[in-house]
């Protein structure tokens, strides 16, 4: 039993509808295994606002909300189809809004849910890795709750259980 939700992960995708992730399990599709160590969720601190008076003393302070970006690389393998939402990209822009789940191989650790995101993809090629599709999902404020949520992967996924 792990303590951290690190290491190899399973990624799932679904279309986001009206700012929410679908509740039906059949609407979620597992993505191909990403390139090793390419999956990461990055948090960017919000812009701070500080009111200062003459002399530099702080009168008030208001922190801005964080923003989140999920990134991962998928190999373009011979004989394997890329997910259809990736193939619909026009010059790198994937139409629609998307939801993502990140689950550790060890289901005793917390899983991550992004209910609403916009996506872009970038193709690259190297002799080391072949053709890679770099996926960048910029998380948007969902219909309810926090932009990034955590849930218990041991039980069947239910968006309403995400906190």
What is each residue range found by the language model?
Residues 19-20, 79-81, 105-113, 145-147:
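Short, surface-exposed beta-strand/loop "edge" segments at domain boundaries and coil↔beta transitions
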Residues 14, 101-105, 140:
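A generic structural motif
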Residues 1-77, 116-130:
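Solvent-exposed edge beta-strands and adjacent loop segments
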Residues 69-73, 99-101, 134-138:
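Beta-strand secondary-structure signal
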Residues 18-19, 81-92, 147, 152-161:
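Short secondary-structure boundary segments
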Residues 83-111:
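Short, acidic/charged, Gly/Pro-enriched secondary-structure junctions
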Residues 110-163:
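Mixed-charge, glycine-accented linear interaction segment located at domain edges/termini
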